């Protein structure tokens, strides 16, 4: 069985990432739970351990794709991409949340708060979170004014201050309200 979870759904900037994880039968992971509740450094160590003891894959959906559709579709697409990349096909994939990807030959079961209930979903949550956080840290080096190395693209006060002062980048999600409002106000200013 595989566990699948996505991260970055509520961010104002950056892609959505998902991971699909099939844990080795003999693995024992202490302290595994929802990735958002684990300190950053411990998450990195857990991610490395999980990767060594599993079959896993990561899928992502770019900001360009998110801007063309909606965040729910993007989240499901990232999960679908992760599942399709798995080198081993699971009999069933347990998906965190109420929705599962469509048009995929793997049987999917949704589990509300699955990252708190099923170990392979929690493992997927950790791998997805670490992968996306590291991506945003790297991207933040090119755009230091938004402090993505600390907020990872979420709508923190620092990020919102950066948006107000410097405007948006191509990595911001144009349909998300704070970004959309900035675009509208800029349009009004130029008319």
Predicted features along the sequence, with ranges:
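RNase H-like, Mg2+-dependent phosphodiesterase core
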Residues: 1-191
């Amino acid at each position: 069985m595989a566990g699948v979870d996505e991260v970055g759904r509520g961010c104002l900037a950056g892609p959505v990432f998902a991971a699909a994880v099939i844990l080795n039968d003999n693995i024992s992971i202490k302290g595994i739970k929802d990735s958002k509740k684990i300190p950053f450094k411990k998450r990195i160590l857990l991610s490395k351990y999980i990767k060594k003891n599993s079959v896993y894959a990561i899928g992502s959906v770019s900001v360009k794709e998110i801007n063309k559709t909606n965040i729910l579709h993007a989240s499901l697409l990232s999960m679908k991409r992760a599942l399709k990349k798995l080198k081993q096909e699971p009999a069933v994939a347990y998906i965190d949340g109420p929705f599962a990807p469509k048009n995929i030959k793997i049987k999917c079961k949704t589990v509300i708060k699955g990252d708190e209930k099923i170990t392979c979903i929690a493992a997927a949550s950790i791998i997805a979170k670490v992968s996306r956080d590291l991506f945003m840290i790297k991207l933040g080096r090119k755009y230091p004014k938004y402090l993505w190395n600390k907020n990872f693209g979420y709508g923190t006060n620092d990020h919102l201050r950066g948006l107000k002062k410097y405007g948006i980048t191509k990595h911001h999600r144009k349909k998300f309200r704070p970004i959309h409002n900035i675009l509208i106000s800029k349009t009004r200013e130029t008319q």
